[in-house]
């Protein structure tokens, strides 16, 4: 079965999923359904027990310190570009990408060392990808960024285009989780997860809903202010 974030170290994968989990549950401790989904992502990424515990802690800790730990690890990883791209994708999912939501994502990008030009290009990548609505295999193809007309711009800005599309949870997550759920069902393991859910009852749609404003992504600003000392 295809693995999530397969080309990255255990520490990087744990930091990436930990950051997503921490932001998604910024104003509350993760529910049982949310935790089941988050742990399914950890399973699909083949995380070690140590990193699974770290991701779980990030989903239940509300001070923002676990998020800071995750971001500090990602500062030196190409996954930082994938993380910001995913956050923009999640924020735009409900077509209500507010100025406050954008400002919160920009805080994360700035903390990760992503400059304004790079952020603007990642934003363009999200918009152009949404227009094409590609499948997982198409996005991972070497020619995909060229088709969007962004490959040279991304290269010149210092973004590693070979790694950008390999860490996109917003694109790869549903398909990988669907395969994971089919594997569980074949073994007779029950689960409430629906990776294609678009509502607030668990699954990728639940995470998107939380990050896009369904549960107030804009309200995560309070935690970000604590983390970044603003």
Task: Please report, for each region that a protein language model flagged, where it lies by residue.
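Small-residue-enriched hydrophobic alpha-helices in membranes
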Residues: 1-22, 32-93, 99-230
């Amino acid at each position: 079965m295809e693995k999530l974030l397969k080309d990255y170290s255990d520490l990087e994968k744990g930091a990436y999923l930990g950051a997503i989990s921490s932001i998604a549950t910024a104003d509350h401790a993760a529910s049982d359904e949310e935790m089941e989904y988050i742990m399914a992502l950890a399973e699909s990424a083949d995380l070690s027990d140590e990193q699974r515990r770290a991701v779980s802690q990030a989903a239940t800790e509300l001070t923002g310190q676990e998020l800071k730990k995750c971001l500090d690890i990602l500062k030196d990883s190409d996954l930082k570009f994938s993380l910001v791209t995913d956050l923009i994708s999640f924020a735009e999912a409900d077509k209500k990408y507010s100025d406050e939501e954008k400002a919160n994502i920009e805080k994360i990008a700035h903390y990760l060392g992503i400059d304004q030009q790079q952020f603007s290009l990642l934003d363009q990548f999200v918009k152009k990808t949404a227009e094409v609505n590609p499948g997982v295999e198409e996005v991972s193809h070497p020619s995909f960024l060229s088709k969007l007309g962004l490959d040279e711009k991304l290269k010149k800005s210092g973004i590693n285009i070979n790694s950008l599309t390999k860490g996109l949870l917003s694109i790869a997550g549903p398909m990988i989780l669907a395969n994971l759920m089919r594997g569980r069902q074949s073994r007779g393991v029950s689960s409430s997860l629906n990776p294609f859910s678009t509502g607030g009852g668990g699954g990728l749609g639940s995470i998107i809903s939380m990050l896009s404003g369904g549960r107030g992504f804009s309200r995560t600003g309070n935690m970000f202010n604590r983390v970044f000392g603003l």
